[in-house]
């Protein structure tokens, strides 16, 4: 196992970790008004790009 030869400073450690954050998901609103994730079919109405792609059970 590798062992470091010199101590990494707080600055160098912070610079290395600068990209480790969790990305905030982008939220868009469907034509039905429900929030959804981009490039996915709407879970509430089943539409994608204005077309019905997921069959919804009759209510």
Swiss-Prot record:
Gene: rpmF
InterPro entries in alphabetical order: Ribosomal_bL32 (IPR002677), Ribosomal_bL32_bact (IPR044957), Ribosomal_zn-bd (IPR011332)
Similarity comment: family membership: Belongs to the bacterial ribosomal protein bL32 family.
Ranges for region Disordered: 1-20
GO cellular component terms listed in the entry, alphabetical order: large ribosomal subunit
A GO term for molecular function: structural constituent of ribosome
UniProt keyword terms in alphabetical order: Ribonucleoprotein, Ribosomal protein
Biased composition range(s): Basic residues: 7-19
Species name: Nitratidesulfovibrio vulgaris (strain DSM 19637 / Miyazaki F)
Protein name as catalogued: Large ribosomal subunit protein bL32
A single BP term in Gene Ontology: translation
């Amino acid at each position: 196992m590798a062992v470091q030869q010199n101590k990494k400073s707080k600055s160098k450690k912070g610079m290395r970790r600068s990209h480790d954050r969790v990305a905030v998901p982008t939220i868009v609103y469907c034509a039905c008004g429900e929030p959804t994730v981009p490039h996915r079919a709407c879970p509430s109405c089943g539409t994608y790009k204005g077309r019905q792609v997921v069959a919804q059970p009759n209510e």
